[in-house]
Amino acid sequence: MVSSPATQLSVLATDGRLQFLYPHQNVRLDTLTLQKTDTMKRLVSLFLLAPLAISTLTLSANGQKAYKIALSNSFYGNTWRKQMVDVMQKAADGAKAQGLISDFVVDNGDGTANTQLAQLNSLILSHPDAILINAASPTALNGAIAQAAQQGIKVVIFDSLTTSTDAYQIAYDNSSWGEIAANYVVKRLGSKGGNVLITRGVVGSQPELLIYGAIMKILKSHPENHILGEVDTEADNAKAQSAVANLLPSMPKMDAVLSEGSYGVVQAFLAAGKPVPLVIGNNRAEFILWWIDEKAKNGYQTISLGSEPSIGVVAFWLSIHILQGDKVPEMKAQPYLLPLVAVDNDTVEQFKDIKPGTVIAHQYDDQWVKDNILNKQ
């Protein structure tokens, strides 16, 4: 795997505390501002070009082609994915105003590979210049991706990756996410262990498979911990609350729950009148705000880990640079990795102003991509 430059992965220190500070400087968050930065001023002249009978290309004001970009998003059923589409649309609107793109098409799926494959085949027939894919399956889309590449369409896969080598791929180190979460639980439960419930995310997606696999590997290597079961949540708080609430009457005491739908898990325990166990967070606003309050009242301790919906913006700007012929890092044989965002008891108050209904995420833009990816090869 290719790691992004100047990054530091979340790790557990010998005392069990999570040591993490997001390494990139001069970046803002989608949901709050931690550090003020100067926004690059862009002066763009826009002209209306009369259609040319001899050409079907859409040209920008400087005579360069304005690209058509398409997004194939496998799933739209949780806060993370909705925020992802929103910030990508905002980036596309800005690029269109600059004359860099002529259109941005979004296809949202139902979480199944079959639906996404059908949508992807339809997109290929429309022949956009680039297709951005958040994949439902690591393998099911490979044939369509190869077909797109053969037709000269640039393909950038992000967040949920595939095994294709025909596309540029960028994601997070999700195996480390699972390892960090599980190791923290093992450390907190101690030598006597305890009862653990697994709450899974978007089952079948590549990130979820990596997170789940890493969690299970760690827990099974510590047999003092008993896995009570697992439930699917689609990384959605409401689904997590319902699934956990259905289990609670028949389950023995739970000591830890990891790692999706964290606020829904909390609500299930509270509604049942049971004490909230150790719950690993997933960087959703509702859990972060509950944690801050519960820490102040009762000293609640945990960690929260997550990828960022704004990775879609990174993929968007990368696709434009690829189309413009700019040199980008190797991303086909091995994915390019961004660092996870991790929060612990020492840093959670930094996010007290997070907007409800959002996920902690940096606000990436074209300049960030230039400074931190293109110019650091």
Range-by-range predicted roles:
Residues 65-67, 207, 218-219, 307, ...:
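Hinge/cleft segment of the Venus flytrap/periplasmic-binding protein
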Residues 68-95, 104-117, 126, 134-138, ...:
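Extracytoplasmic "Venus flytrap"
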Residues 1-68, 125, 146-151, 371-377:
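Short, low-complexity disordered leader/linker segments with a strong preference
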Residues 74-84, 173-174, 181, 197-218, ...:
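Extracytoplasmic ligand-binding site segments that recognize negatively charged/polar headgroups
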Residues 121, 125, 129-149, 215, ...:
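Hydrophobic alpha-helical
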Residues 116, 170-195, 240-241, 285-290, ...:
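Hydrophobic alpha-helical segments within soluble ligand-binding/sensing domains
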Residues 95-109, 197-198, 219-237:
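Short beta-strand elements in bilobed, periplasmic/extracellular small-molecule ligand-binding domains
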Residues 138-176, 286-297:
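Flexible loop/hinge segments that line or gate small-molecule binding clefts
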